[in-house]
Amino acid sequence: MPSPAPSGLAPGFLVAAPALGDPNFAGSLVLMAEHHGEGALGFVVNRPGPVTVAEVLASVDEDLRRAAEANGRAGAPVLVGGPVQPERLWILFRPGGIGADAEGAVPVGNGLSLGGSRELLEALVRAPRGDPFLLLLGYAGWAPMQVEREVAAGAWVPLELEGSDLVFDVPLEQRWETAVRRLGLEPGGFLVGGGGASA
């Protein structure tokens, strides 16, 4: 069984406990990208939004939309990364190869990198071999000590980030349940005190 994340929550996952009351995060799996004394930043990686990759790309560049259609990526949902800055586009991808040297790309850890530049977006969308990536709008943010209090209250259960498979290889609708089982639990088998990230 994977061990819980160490005291620093990033890189790692936060698994929402079943009774988490915040509608922004109920049933969510959050990839934690930053966690330090000034707060924390993460991305919900299992909540599809109302727009597709094609719709977002069409607002950037019609040629990119056509490239996504040619690569079979156009119909994929853009995920709701969180309630903070919902208009901001983020790109989550596997480092190495396509996009590895793109401007602004930063490693999250254990097989995942994050960016938001147009250069990175173009490289990934046009890649002929189909390197996996996710587009996310918005992020989840926590003030200093907020996420620690929420974890202590039972709103979230930390899970170690052991690779990118939970993000890219597990179907969207199964990610939360898979994470719960990796904790050695069954869905519905643990309780929550409350809490939620900032909006």
UniProtKB/Swiss-Prot annotation:
Residues annotated as transmembrane: none
Family annotation (Pfam families): DUF179
Cellular component per GO, a single term: cytosol
Domain of life assignment: Bacteria
InterPro entries: AlgH-like (IPR003774)
Signal peptide from the UniProt entry: none
Family the UniProt entry places it in: Belongs to the UPF0301 (AlgH) family.
Name this polypeptide is given: UPF0301 protein Anae109_0457
Organism listed in the record: Anaeromyxobacter sp. (strain Fw109-5)
